[in-house]
From Swiss-Prot:
Protein name per its UniProtKB record: Large ribosomal subunit protein uL23
RNA-binding recorded as keyword: yes
Keywords linked to the UniProt accession: Ribonucleoprotein, Ribosomal protein, RNA-binding, rRNA-binding
Taxonomic lineage from the root: Archaea, Methanobacteriati, Methanobacteriota, Thermococci, Thermococcales
Organism the protein comes from: Thermococcus gammatolerans (strain DSM 15229 / JCM 11827 / EJ3)
Gene name, Swiss-Prot/TrEMBL: rpl23
Similarity annotation: Belongs to the universal ribosomal protein uL23 family.
């Protein structure tokens, strides 16, 4: 799957911002058909980082949300700043 079709948009909520600061995690709304491997590959390719873990869930709205934990050597705050979240 094309990485630019996997990730639809970053999610900016109070919880998402606290996860960036405390747990080095980014939150995205992703394509409903995307697997965890697709999401990992897309984030690594788009942002030039290494992903440690991906957790996904389907929201009540029917969207798929992905929590992407980056490896300790990468900083989620820097990626968020590049995306314009801060």
């Amino acid at each position: 799957m094309d990485p630019y079709k996997v990730i639809i948009r970053p999610l900016v909520t109070e919880k998402a911002v606290s996860l960036i600061e405390k747990e080095n995690k980014l939150t995205f709304i992703v394509d409903r058909k995307a697997t965890k491997q697709d999401i990992k590959r897309a984030v690594e390719e788009m942002f030039n980082v290494k992903v440690e873990k991906v957790n996904t869930l389907i929201t009540m709205k029917g969207e798929k949300k992905a929590y992407v934990k980056l490896r300790p050597e990468y900083n989620a705050s820097e990626i968020a700043a590049r995306l314009g979240l801060f």
